[in-house]
Amino acid sequence: MAPIKIGINGFGRIGRLVARVALQRDDVELVAVNDPFISTDYMTYMFKYDSVHGAWKHHELKVKDEKTLLFGEKPVVVFGRRNPEEIPRASTGAEYIVESTGVFTDKDKAAAHLKGGAKKVIISAPSKDAPMFVVGVNEKEYKSDLHIVSNASCTTNCLAPLAKVINDRFGIVEGLMTTVHSITATQKTVDGPSAKDWRGGRAASFNIIPSSTGAAKAVGKVLPQLNGKLTGMSFRVPTVDVSVVDLTVRLEKKATYEQIKAAIKEESEGKLKGILGYTEDDVVSTDFVGDSRSSIFDAKAGIALNDNFVKLVSWYDNEWGYSTRVVDLIVHMASVQ
């Protein structure tokens, strides 16, 4: 099958990393990037050098002209349009658009890409009205008549596979999630204005900042049987990448911690291989930089109070793992056409 032609709208953290993932795969072809705020030469610099994931070491990258980047001999067309309707998709052949600006996150706004000639839009963020899919959990529910979808959030992608295994095997009565989450681009380097979230305006580099997250509730959208059973919060911490989910649940069926570990290990080596990981090593956050899995269960970090009440810990590279799932979702969608 010919590679799936994709375009990226918004060349921020996720946009650039989706590009890195796509350019290292044979099943997709990056043909276009749109960002109205970045010149082609600056785009090249931002892509080539990355403080977390290192310098680009694959194809040689250079600017052919102000509208074209060359990855080796592979041209990628660059646009700078604010309105997605104005991007001439037909000229590049881009059918699947990764919407990673953080602006066009509902169906009405994302539909501008369809008006511009795109076939499908994948929002790289939670959406209030677009159907959400988590690869490994509910992607099989995707139907070809859905043209705008959401890849949910990085935290939902970590939590959902773990919650699915636990619920399928033992049943979840209720649970609370905390994610200890690395800094993101929306935070402040020093104390600054943040009218909607006062604590969120405090300096990211030397504070632990409590924050809200809809990730746990969103699990109920991809796993309806858990709707209303989970909620959660976040602590933003001064690390640049890799986050960790702490899921504390009450179980329907009694299970020892050893039985829970065995169930997760079995799934990580079976149906969820490549999505859900399992480790008994004495790991820390930097050990997962560049890990493409959505969720890596830390067997040594969890604890059980009794056979019905347990705390489970799972790591995720909130940048690289999530960006890999965006591309995986595109490949799955194309297979359903």
UniProtKB/Swiss-Prot annotation:
Molecular-function GO term, any one: NAD binding
Location within or outside the cell: Cytoplasm
Sorted UniProt keywords: Cytoplasm, Glycolysis, NAD, Oxidoreductase
Active-site positions on this chain: C154 (nucleophile)
Chief location bin: cytoplasm
Pfam families associated with the record: Gp_dh_C (PF02800), Gp_dh_N (PF00044)
InterPro entries: GlycerAld/Erythrose_P_DH, GlycerAld_3-P_DH_AS, GlycerAld_3-P_DH_cat, GlycerAld_3-P_DH_NAD(P)-bd, Glyceraldehyde-3-P_DH_1, NAD(P)-bd_dom_sf
SMART domains: Gp_dh_N
GO cellular component labels: cytosol
EC number(s) reported in the record: 1.2.1.12
Pathway(s) where this gene product acts: Carbohydrate degradation; glycolysis; pyruvate from D-glyceraldehyde 3-phosphate: step 1/5
Residues where D-glyceraldehyde 3-phosphate binds: S153, C154, T155, T184, T213, G214, R236
UniProt subunit comment: Homotetramer.
Family: Belongs to the glyceraldehyde-3-phosphate dehydrogenase family.
More details: Plants contain two types of GAPDH: cytosolic forms which participate in glycolysis and chloroplast forms which participate in photosynthesis. All the forms are encoded by distinct genes.
NCBIfam families: GAPDH-I
Stated role: Key enzyme in glycolysis that catalyzes the first step of the pathway by converting D-glyceraldehyde 3-phosphate (G3P) into 3-phospho-D-glyceroyl phosphate. Essential for the maintenance of cellular ATP levels and carbohydrate metabolism.
Protein's name in the database: Glyceraldehyde-3-phosphate dehydrogenase, cytosolic
Organism, scientific name: Antirrhinum majus (Garden snapdragon)
Native organism taxonomy: Eukaryota, Viridiplantae, Streptophyta, Embryophyta, Tracheophyta
